């Protein structure tokens, strides 16, 4: 694909991400109608309004492309090399509880490979953009992963499954890392976790039970900023996997070593995350 075409897609995605983000920002802190997709997995009318805007714009502009969206919208075209992967509100739990850490995430894949990723944090007005072979930026400034080369100096981030039994198993890995690193964070937004690695704010991220819309845009961000993204066994990463390990690259082997002592491939089919 020509660079000019990728530029066009990226520009379009940034515009709709900003517009969807404005919906979230305007509704943040207001009373919400909350529905539960599971015991603790929620969706608000803000998710639905932001997704409706994104889906409408994408269908009008690129009606032949496939769509994969968190809140249920799907494309009708069975065969297309292009797929938009959208999370209109990554961090719904934060949003619903009045915590200002959430984002709009939009990715475009060609033949299963990401070619653009856009993540917009409307509360901080931070726009992360990546293009295949073109690097990653934050508000127009080039991003580069951290140079951290020791676990004890690193800050990691993770997330936990909505399944309580699975959380107990995940906690074993968390406890092991906790004795080896400077700190572990949990932001509640997979998309921002990955963008923060790309920006050098965090050094590594692992999680099982995630969905394509959680990580498709952010994974490209990490790669284009010089980092590494694999599955949790060190194999090739695909957005339809339900697991991810991302890092600044330098620490990737150390992270894999710790995870291997705790993670069993049999739990790779964890339920979809937020």
Predicted regions and their residues:
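Short secondary-structure boundary/capping segments
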Residues: 34, 59, 74-77, 119, ...
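Residue-level signal for inorganic ion chemistry
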Residues: 24, 47, 58, 92, ...
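DPxDG-like acidic metal-binding loop motif
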Residues: 78-137, 152
